[in-house]
């Protein structure tokens, strides 16, 4: 392509689809000038802009191309003068915008069925938000095709600088809903922490930082993750290098801030993912102290599936006029079918064995209510001849990281865990969740079953209910306004397999 028109109409230097943004390419090299010695400069004072000789038969595209070159001349001549209105762009935007898209390394298209939780959109495209070209490249190469409903609502508002209180179901694209505006607003030439993303667990911190790195892989943005249970010394050394976006747990970030290593005076955006958990008594004091280190004009984005009373108190104090997004017409995901089976405690392992033999499991997560029961059940499942990992909060951090990584990469079919794993963990291959021990609260139940049926796909939740659990089952059904049916002798694979 001619270097003088390196950025075709409508998608200027580093901007996606903005017809008012003009990018100017570098002047042609000496080799190129030698090639076109027969050409005359169009203006005596602007030798670097060289116009081609007219072709005998011009196609509309060539005409558009020349129009663009001439527009560059006009822009150069008008430097220092008042800004001129851009002439209307013809149908060149759509055709020329395919040039950079054609070079993208797109993943295989996901052709599985998706529910309305992610498809009921207004029809917007990511390019409608005038994002940086490099960020758009990362978005498409991550496999995102169009914004989900929560992304449509939050991305344009977050880009304006408003505070946001967003409530949406698990697995509907909340992470990208705050990562995309965060990456867009970061000035990569400014060596300072500009965005902090707070999450309640170490696994979620690793997952979120990975999403940020993948979306921003064409940007020169440095992402760092820091959590408790890892080397403080390594984090301190890392913070002396450039860091633009920091992801971590509140306690560790506060610790680094108090030591004067993590400087937040230029941090313009604070994101709280799983905000209801972050505002529990365990984390809230750390977060309130951390906010004191932020500038007064900072922007706060809060995302969660559930918002208890503690969130309201925090909102009233720190988010006086937030933009409220509520996409929770119902609490459970449309694609998840829920069943229960009445069993005695001593029959649970036998029942689990029957489920393994009858269900078409891609990957499953099995929840227990205590650390001891996790380890015992994992041992039993292995004895039955099924591959199984387990994870809980009392394991060493390195071991937890390895299990999480291996399970996500498909090294094992079944994972037994405590509620540590209920928040935000996004493993697309999981299509079955089994509550070996039924949870005590509706909130926990909601987060557990939300591990299957990610991003509008189909999933199955099976609950093993003892005599003592029967009242809890009824109460949770009422609170969530959902139906948990008795398990039939045969389950149609079409309801949870794509």
Curated annotation (Swiss-Prot):
Region entry Disordered, spans: 1-109
Motif extent (DEAD box): 273-276
Keyword Mitochondrion included in the entry's annotation: no
Keywords tagged on the record: ATP-binding, Cytoplasm, Helicase, Hydrolase, mRNA processing, mRNA transport, Nucleotide-binding, RNA-binding, Translation regulation, Transport
Location(s) in or outside the cell: Cytoplasm, P-body
A single GO cellular-component term on record: cytoplasmic stress granule
Pfam family for this entry, one: Helicase_C
SMART domains: DEXDc (SM00487), HELICc (SM00490)
Known EC number: 3.6.4.13
Biased composition (Basic residues): 33-49
Source organism, top-level taxon: Eukaryota
Motif (Q motif): 124-152
Membrane-crossing residue ranges in chain numbering: none
Domain Helicase ATP-binding: residue ranges: 155-325
Swiss-Prot/TrEMBL catalytic activity: ATP + H2O = ADP + phosphate + H(+)
Start and end residues of each Helicase C-terminal domain: 335-495
Residues holding ATP: 168-175
Presence of keyword Transport: yes
GO molecular function: ATP binding; ATP hydrolysis activity; mRNA binding; RNA helicase activity
Low complexity composition-biased segments: 50-61, 75-86
Cross-referenced PANTHER family: DEAD-BOX ATP-DEPENDENT RNA HELICASE 50
Stated role: ATP-dependent RNA helicase involved in mRNA turnover, and more specifically in mRNA decapping.
Family statement drawn from the similarity comment of this UniProt entry: Belongs to the DEAD box helicase family. DDX6/DHH1 subfamily.
Domain comment (free text): The Q motif is unique to and characteristic of the DEAD box family of RNA helicases and controls ATP binding and hydrolysis.
Protein name: DEAD-box ATP-dependent RNA helicase 6
Species this protein is from: Oryza sativa subsp. japonica
């Amino acid at each position: 392509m001619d270097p003088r028109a390196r950025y075709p109409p409508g998608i200027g230097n580093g901007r996606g689809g903005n017809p008012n943004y003009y990018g100017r390419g570098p002047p042609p090299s000496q080799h190129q000038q030698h090639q076109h010695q027969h050409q005359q400069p169009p203006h005596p004072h602007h030798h670097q802009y060289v116009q081609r000789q007219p072709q005998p038969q011009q196609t509309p595209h060539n005409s558009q191309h020349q129009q663009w070159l001439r527009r560059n001349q006009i822009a150069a001549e008008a430097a220092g003068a008042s800004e001129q209105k851009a002439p209307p762009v013809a149908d060149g935007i759509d055709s020329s915008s395919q040039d950079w898209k054609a070079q993208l390394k797109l993943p295989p298209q996901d052709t599985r069925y998706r529910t309305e939780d992610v498809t009921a959109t207004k029809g917007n495209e990511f390019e409608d938000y005038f994002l940086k070209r490099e960020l758009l490249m990362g978005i498409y190469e991550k496999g995102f095709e169009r914004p989900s409903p929560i992304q449509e609502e939050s991305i344009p508002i977050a880009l304006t600088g408003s505070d946001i209180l967003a409530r949406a179901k698990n697995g509907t694209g909340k992470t990208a809903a705050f990562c995309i505006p965060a990456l867009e607003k970061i000035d990569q030439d400014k060596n300072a922490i500009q965005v902090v993303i707070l999450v309640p667990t170490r696994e979620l911190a690793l997952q979120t930082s990975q999403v940020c790195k993948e979306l921003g892989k064409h940007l020169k943005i440095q992402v760092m993750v820091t959590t408790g249970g890892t080397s403080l010394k390594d984090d301190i050394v890392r913070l002396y290098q450039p860091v633009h976006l920091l992801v971590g747990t509140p306690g560790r970030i506060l610790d680094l801030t108090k030591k004067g290593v993590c400087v937040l005076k230029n941090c313009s955006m604070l994101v709280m993912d799983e905000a209801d958990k972050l505002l529990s008594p365990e984390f809230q004091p750390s977060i309130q102290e951390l906010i004191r280190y932020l500038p007064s004009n900072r922007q706060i984005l809060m995302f969660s599936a559930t918002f208890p009373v503690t969130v309201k108190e925090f909102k009233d104090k720190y988010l006086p006029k937030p933009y409220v997004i509520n996409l929770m017409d119902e609490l459970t995901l449309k694609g998840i079918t829920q069943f229960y089976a009445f069993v005695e405690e001593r029959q649970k392992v036998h029942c689990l064995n029957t489920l393994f033999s009858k269900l078409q499991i891609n990957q499953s997560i099995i929840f227990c209510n205590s650390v001891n029961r996790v380890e015992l059940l994992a041992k039993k499942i292995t004895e039955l001849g099924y591959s199984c990992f387990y994870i809980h909060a009392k394991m060493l951090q390195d071991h937890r990281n390895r299990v999480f990584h291996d399970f996500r990469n498909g090294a094992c079919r079944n994972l037994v865990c405590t509620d540590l794993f209920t928040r935000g963990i996004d493993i697309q291959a999981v299509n079955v969740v089994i509550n070996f021990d039924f949870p005590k609260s509706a909130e926990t139940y909601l987060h557990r079953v939300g591990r299957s049926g990610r991003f509008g796909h189909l999933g199955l939740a099976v609950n093993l209910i003892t005599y003592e659990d029967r009242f809890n089952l009824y109460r949770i059904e009422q609170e969530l306004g959902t139906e948990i049916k008795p398990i039939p002798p045969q389950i149609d694979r079409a309801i949870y397999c794509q």
